[in-house]
């Protein structure tokens, strides 16, 4: 299993806490490299073939410490322009993205695949690794690294040596010296990126249908759950409203926009209600699996019943068990949604608010409403402040 994004973010958070309590001290040591080691490390720099990543220097005399280099790699990896492919559904709530964690793994994979190749040419690879990072009397000792960096290199090189490829990485690697990461910033960067992609996709959709929204016009798109019907407000131009509503409701565009709004919600969002969200989850699951909408069904003895007189949960169970994969976990889903449907039936479907979501639009960008964080174009000053606060420097 490869190191996943969540694991890295967890390590980042832990490192941030530790760094606040015990700032790392770096020792300046004199260099005494063995010729063979110097050649090996220099070769790492010259042989690197991955675009962008090869800017990182793995040589003994100059371990990477350039946050600007990492920034360029990150920006290059996520420089994607949306084009019109002709598909009906243009808006996508989840677009391809390379996070800081993804890029760090790529950099470490490249570095340590090469280091592993060098280590394996030695008669005693493990002894050679120990000499570099644990034996201060060895001519191979990496005196230019801090104690934490030597430990990271030891962990990462032995991981490759014993397993053939890293399953876990020690992230205090010298290749990221002087580059500060933070899990919360990483999560927010992805939301900003996704907003940029959806903004482009929406513009493609408008351009394709020859819809022009005048500069300065401030619109609000409101979307209902399950059927994903869109209502546009903010202008007296009824023709413009009709055009936008029609194009957003083509394909799955309104559904994808709804999901994008949901994924962009911050913790203080006034639009989020746990009760309404759980109702949406249950109603959506029933609709997508059985084709029945809860609001159209009768409740008899606390159970939702289809027009044919069947218990909706029986239909749900039957549909799940048609899929060999879903059949293995069907019992858990059935138990959970049976409980949720019972709660909705007891309270009354209409007594629980619908999970209706809205988002503003102006000057070519979607803009979040009812929350302190907006991911729209020109609205992310709060993120720059967070980066300064957390010391993120890429």
Swiss-Prot record:
Which Pfam families is this protein grouped with?
Answer: DUF4885
- Database matches in InterPro entries: DUF4885 (IPR032617)
Instruction: Output this protein's name.
Output: Uncharacterized protein YbdO
| Organism of this sequence | Bacillus subtilis (strain 168)
């Amino acid at each position: 299993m490869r190191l996943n994004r969540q694991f890295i973010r967890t390590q980042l958070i832990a490192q941030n806490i530790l760094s606040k309590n015990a700032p790392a001290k770096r020792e300046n040591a004199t260099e005494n490299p063995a010729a063979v080691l110097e050649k090996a490390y220099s070769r790492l720099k010259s042989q690197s073939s991955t675009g962008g990543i090869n800017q990182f220097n793995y040589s003994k005399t100059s371990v990477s410490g350039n946050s600007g280099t990492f920034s360029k790699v990150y920006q290059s990896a996520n420089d994607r322009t949306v084009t019109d492919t002709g598909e009906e559904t243009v808006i996508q709530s989840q677009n391809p993205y390379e996070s800081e964690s993804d890029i760090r793994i790529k950099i470490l994979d490249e570095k340590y695949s090469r280091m592993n190749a060098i280590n394996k040419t030695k008669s005693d690879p493990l002894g050679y690794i120990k000499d570099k990072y644990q034996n201060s009397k060895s001519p191979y000792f990496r005196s230019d690294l801090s104690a934490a960096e030597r430990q990271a290199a030891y962990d990462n090189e032995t991981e490759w040596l014993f397993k053939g490829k890293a399953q876990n990485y020690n992230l205090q690697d010298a290749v990221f010296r002087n580059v500060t990461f933070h899990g919360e910033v990483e999560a927010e960067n992805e939301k900003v990126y996704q907003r940029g992609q959806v903004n482009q996709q929406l513009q493609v959709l408008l351009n394709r249908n020859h819809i022009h929204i005048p500069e300065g016009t401030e619109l609000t798109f409101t979307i209902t759950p399950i059927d994903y019907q869109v209502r546009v407000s903010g202008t007296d131009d009824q023709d413009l409203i009709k055009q936008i509503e029609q194009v957003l409701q083509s394909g799955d565009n309104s559904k994808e926009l709804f999901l994008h709004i949901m994924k962009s919600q911050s913790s203080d969002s006034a639009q989020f209600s746990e009760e309404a969200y759980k109702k949406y989850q249950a109603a959506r699951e029933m609709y997508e699996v059985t084709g029945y909408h809860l609001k159209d069904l009768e409740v008899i003895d606390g159970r939702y019943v289809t027009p044919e007189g069947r218990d909706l949960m029986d239909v749900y169970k039957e549909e799940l068990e048609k899929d060999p994969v879903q059949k293995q976990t069907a019992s858990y889903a059935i138990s959970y949604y049976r409980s949720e449907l019972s709660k909705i039936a007891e309270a009354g479907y209409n007594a629980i608010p619908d999970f209706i979501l809205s988002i503003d639009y102006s000057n070519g960008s979607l803009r979040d409403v009812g929350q302190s964080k907006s991911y729209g174009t020109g609205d992310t000053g709060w993120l720059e402040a967070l980066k300064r606060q957390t010391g993120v420097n890429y």
